[in-house]
Amino acid sequence: MADMPPVLRHPEKAHRPDQPQPKKPDWIRVKAPTSQGYKDTRDILRNNRLSTVCEEAGCPNVGECWSQGHATMMIMGEICTRGCSFCNVMTGKPNALDVFEPGRVAHAVQKLGLKHVVITSVDRDDLDDGGAEHFAQTIRAIRHRSPASTIEVLTPDFLKSKPGALEAVVEARPDVFNHNLETVPGLYPTVRPGARYFHSLRLLQQVKELDPGMFTKSGIMVGLGEDRQGILQVMDDMRAADVDFITIGQYLQPTPKHHRVDRFVTPEEFKGYEKAAYGKGFLMVSATPLTRSSYHAGDDFAQLRAARLAKLGRA
């Protein structure tokens, strides 16, 4: 029997010319994962048949996070209905939802002993509600098995979903609602063509309208071709939507078919973005070359909560 051809992870990118991949500077390099903690986390996830964005998106921090028993669960399968030019998650026609997945996620959270758990997903434009009810069921399952754990969701934009999708997630009461803007609006046609900048911004604003006490969070990548003024404008837009927490990290090109790295932003520039963001009123800022949405999310949540209490004069 002839060998089957390898699965093409990004068929929508196959026609694109290869983009040069510049050499990473020293401040981007990370060690390969080898610790026992990493292996234990991997085994728990495998045994529960769970996907993680850590693996699917090729996160550079996977070794550090998994060594500490931290992982970001990716629900609703490994296949995304979008084809963003920066993302390494597989694109194609997804499978049906697994109704037992919320329970398996909750079991893994309990087994890992997570005090703070991050749940994300692929985009599911094929579902009427974009997977909102599946998010809600997962939140409730975790609450049932690990009532002391705090829960952060990193959701898609529900752009093509029926009315009520966002409400379903918010009503399940995650502690943090995260939705990433990813980049400046001028780069959306090439970086995030299936999304709409102002729709995503409005989504974040609506979360606060639905539940003013819920923490909101959003992230952007730099090094895609934006300029400093564009980043500062995104910060202003986020603050106008009452976003509490911003993450800023360096874009890293997964393959030659993905969007090219325009440049590597220096650690000093990240410090400048951090200072600017705090000056604009964010309660929490994470801005480093290796910052990702869920990197150190548990520690960051504790600081975020403390910052709100201090602002309210209750520290």
Swiss-Prot record:
Gene3D superfamilies, per the entry: Aldolase class I (3.20.20.70)
PROSITE patterns, per database record: RADICAL_SAM (PS51918)
Pathway the protein contributes to: Protein modification; protein lipoylation via endogenous pathway; protein N(6)-(lipoyl)lysine from octanoyl-[acyl-carrier-protein]: step 2/2
Enzyme Commission identifier(s): 2.8.1.8
Keywords: 4Fe-4S, Cytoplasm, Iron, Iron-sulfur, Metal-binding, S-adenosyl-L-methionine, Transferase
One function term, GO molecular function aspect: lipoate synthase activity
Radical SAM core domain ranges (all copies): 66-283
Bias type Basic and acidic residues, positions: 9-29
Cofactor note: Binds 2 [4Fe-4S] clusters per subunit. One cluster is coordinated with 3 cysteines and an exchangeable S-adenosyl-L-methionine.
GO cellular component entries: cytoplasm
Binding positions ([4Fe-4S] cluster 1): C54, C59, C65, S294
Known cofactor(s): [4Fe-4S] cluster
Localization annotation: Cytoplasm
Region (Disordered): 1-33
InterPro entries: Aldolase_TIM, Elp3/MiaA/NifB-like_rSAM, LIAS_N, Lipoyl_synth, rSAM
NCBIfam families: lipA, PRK05481.1, PRK12928.1
Protein family per UniProt: Belongs to the radical SAM superfamily. Lipoyl synthase family.
Protein name, UniProt field: Lipoyl synthase
Annotated source species: Paracoccus denitrificans (strain Pd 1222)
